[in-house]
Amino acid sequence: MEFTEQEKKVLADKYETFKEEIELAMIQNCIVECELYSLLAEIIRGTKSGKKISLRDVSVRRKTKLSMWLHGAAGFPDFVVLERKKSRDAAKYGCIEAKRPYDNMEITEQIEGHLNSYGKVIYTNGLIWKFYKVKEKPVKEFCLGCIDPDNQDSVIWEPVNNWYELMSFLEDWNWKS
C-alpha cells in the first residue's frame, strides 16, 4: 500500500510516539513484555486489516472450560486473532507473540506451537517484527531498531521508511488466508 504525503505525516508522528513509548518503558519499567501489549493492540487495530478482525488479549488467561478453545499447543499466546463475529465459535486466524526488546528473536518451540495451533503468527519485540505462516520461514521481517550496545536503555532507531514499510504490510496483511 502506498501512503499519501498526509498519511506519511500522520504515520511519522505515530512512529515518534511509538519510539518514545518504547524508550520510556525501557528506562522507567525495564520494558517488561506487557509494556508492549497496548502499543501492539493500538498499531494492529489502527490498520485496515485490523479493522476486519477481533484482536483479543489472552496473555493472562488461565485454562478454564470457556477459555480452552483459545489455548494452543504452546499455551496461550499474548493475543489471539479471531473472526470479527460476536460469537464464541469465531474462527481463529492467528496470534501475536511479544517479547522484550532484549530477548532473542529466534524461532522457539513456543512459536512453533503457536504456528501449529493458529496458522499465522506475528512475533515481535517491538523492534523486530516477524510474520510467519505455518511451516514457513518468516514471510516478512521488519527492523525498526536495535538496542544500543553502549547503553542498554537506549535504542538505535531505523529511519521512518522502515515504519512506513511495516505499516503498509500490516495494512494489507490477510489474516484469513
Locate each region found by the language model.
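A short, conserved, highly charged catalytic patch centered on acidic carboxylates
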Residues: M1-K120, I128, Y132-S177
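Charged, structured surface patches that assemble and position nucleic-acid processing machinery
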Residues: N125
